UniProtKB/Swiss-Prot annotation:
It comes from Bos taurus (Bovine). Heteropentamer. Part of the GPI-anchor transamidase complex, consisting of PIGK, PIGT, PIGS, PIGU and GAA1. The gene is PIGS. This is GPI-anchor transamidase component PIGS. The chain crosses the membrane at residues 19-39, 518-532. It comes from the Eukaryota.
């Protein structure tokens, strides 16, 4: 009986050892790999090497320029050399990781018969009408006509002319170095019409050191797919003023042509509103010398915040909102004028705030109060108001007056409020800005993934990253080829895809699941099972080790 009990005990011990080994094998062979696979952070492969290469991206902005020479514009020997091509390239000195070079590719040729006839006229406007911009002329390209030194098309004291279209006129010279002298004049003109250091600096203002550029360079709006424009009439004293403004007609006559010409840069929506009892929030000061009130320049920044609370929240808007306010001061503070930093009245009686909008103070004619009962009827001169708002709108989009070369004839924009080459220059700047933004976003995403290991990257997010990288590369290629329209479209796609990937909500799913929380969940689950298995394995190890050291019996 004792032998039978001992045998049963030994069998039970062996069975326990086998069970412990079996459980340990299952945990190690199946459990740990399965747990590791099911709890790992999924990351679709990303083009890290290509993203890293974007930091050293070199942009070459090519501007195609067609230079047309009329008869007697250059010596006969030089005319026989036509046609040929000259390339002028220079680097834009910006302290930024993107290296930008501007390349002017000038294709010289002789004038055709209809061009000779148009340029032989005595009026530049008539000549420009005959030299209507060909429909096949691409965005970003320019045409420069070189006329003879004695041609009466331009005033004799003028050496060049810049028109509203993609056209310019330069006076020639009969000199043995004619091509070199005229070439320098052409470069001055095309730089004024296309790309300058200031234009690109304003576009990259958010990416450059703050002490590098003044606040004026940060005035333009950031590039966006769309913009919302709101015109507001502020009447703080409706008991004294019955204000009427034809905002619909003004938008149709003055604003809509400008926005239609600017449609290539984004989509626009326009609305208007009238706000009663809306005050500026800053008490004007009284000037006894002129019996008027004024707002000093240092108080203008404090005007916006109190008014903005009445304008309606723009938080729900997907696009930047531009506010243009027409303020009719109350009777107790009339007339009201805005002063500049030197204390002089501002001619337009208006001011603007970068990336926000503008405010214009509209004073009621004092004669309206003579013999009239309150409230007096006020008819707003919308032409005068819209001239100010359009000028502010141009500044907010970074469309400033060009830096004209010496002795250059320039008439300014027509009824559209913007010249064709100004739109091209805006698209150049927006393309560079979009590429800089997309590159920064992709680089930040790659750095973030390197620092935080539990960020999930799904396949759709990875596809957006690949799409953004490809769009950046395509935009850079199109810019170097002088294809402005396709380059701008590709740059917009790059920004959209990169930001869609960076701000995808799925990246945050495991971001707030640190390691201490993992241990708090796994220990109660695995510890009760792991302790018996580990103790059994340890006991088996000790017994096995003891059996190895036990000496064998000898007869």
């Amino acid at each position: 009986m004792a032998a039978t009990g001992a045998a049963a005990t030994d069998l039970e011990v062996v069975r326990g050892k086998r069970a412990a080994l079996f459980f340990a094998t299952v945990v190690i062979v199946l459990g740990l790999p399965l747990w590791w696979k099911t709890t790992e952070t999924y990351r679709a492969p990303l083009p890290y090497s290509q993203i890293s290469g974007l930091n050293s991206l070199k942009l070459r902005l090519m501007v195609p320029v067609t230079v047309v020479f009329t008869q007697e514009s250059v010596p006969l020997d030089d005319q026989e050399k036509l046609p040929f091509t000259v390339v002028h390239e220079r680097e834009i000195p910006l302290k930024y990781k993107l290296k930008i070079k501007c390349r002017f590719q000038k294709a010289y040729r002789r004038a055709l018969d209809h061009e000779e006839a148009a340029l032989s006229l005595g009026n530049i406007q008539e000549a420009e009408a005959m030299l209507a911009e060909p429909s096949e002329q691409a965005e970003g390209s320019l045409t420069v006509y070189v006329i003879s030194e004695r041609c009466s098309l331009l005033p004799q004291d003028m050496m060049s002319y810049i028109g509203p279209k993609r056209m310019a006129v330069v006076r020639g010279i009969t000199h043995r170095e004619a091509f070199n002298i005229i070439g320098r004049r052409i470069i001055q003109v095309v730089q004024a019409m296309s790309l300058t250091e200031d234009v690109l600096a304003a576009a990259l203002a958010d990416h450059l050191p703050e002490d590098k550029w003044s606040s004026d360079k940060r005035r333009p709006l950031k590039s966006s797919l769309g913009y919302e424009i709101t015109f507001s009439l502020l009447n703080p004293d409706p008991k004294s003023h019955d204000v009427h403004w034809d905002i619909e007609g003004a938008v149709r006559r003055y604003v809509q042509p400008f926005l239609s010409a600017l449609s290539a840069a984004g989509n626009f929506s326009v609305d208007s509103q009238i706000l009663y009892y809306a005050v500026l929030g800053v008490n004007p000061r009284f000037d006894s010398a002129s019996s008027s009130y004024y707002l000093a320049a240092h108080s203008l920044p404090h005007v916006i915040n109190p008014v903005e609370s009445r304008l309606g929240s723009s938080a729900a808007s997907l696009y930047p909102v531009l506010n243009f306010l027409l303020y009719v001061p109350e009777l107790a503070h009339s007339p009201l004028y805005i002063q500049d930093k030197d204390g002089a009245p501002v001619a337009t009686n208006a001011f603007h705030s970068p990336r926000w909008g503008g405010i214009m103070v509209y004073n009621v004619d004092p004669k309206a109060y003579n013999g009239s009962q309150l409230p007096v009827r006020v008819e707003v001169d919308m032409m005068r108001v819209m001239e100010v708002f359009l000028a502010q709108l141009r500044l907010l989009f970074g469309i400033a007056q060009p830096q004209l070369p010496p002795k250059c004839l320039f008439f300014g924009p027509k009824s559209e409020g913007i010249m064709t080459w100004e739109l091209d220059r805006l698209l150049w700047a927006r393309s560079v800005e979009n590429l800089a933004t997309a590159t920064t976003t992709l680089t930040s995403l790659a750095q973030l993934l390197g620092k935080i290991s539990n960020i999930v990257i799904k396949d759709d997010v990875a596809s957006e990253v690949y799409r953004a990288v490809a769009a950046v590369q395509k935009a850079a290629e199109e810019l170097s080829s002088g294809h402005l329209a396709s380059a701008f479209a590709a740059s917009q796609e790059a920004v959209t895809s990169s930001e869609r990937a960076f701000f995808d909500p799925s990246l945050l799913h495991l971001l707030y699941f640190p390691d201490d929380q993992k241990f708090a969940i796994y220990i109660p689950l695995f510890l009760p099972m792991a302790v018996p298995i580990l103790l059994s394995l340890f006991k088996i190890f000790l017994e096995t080790r003891k059996s190895w050291k036990k000496p064998e019996k000898t007869d």
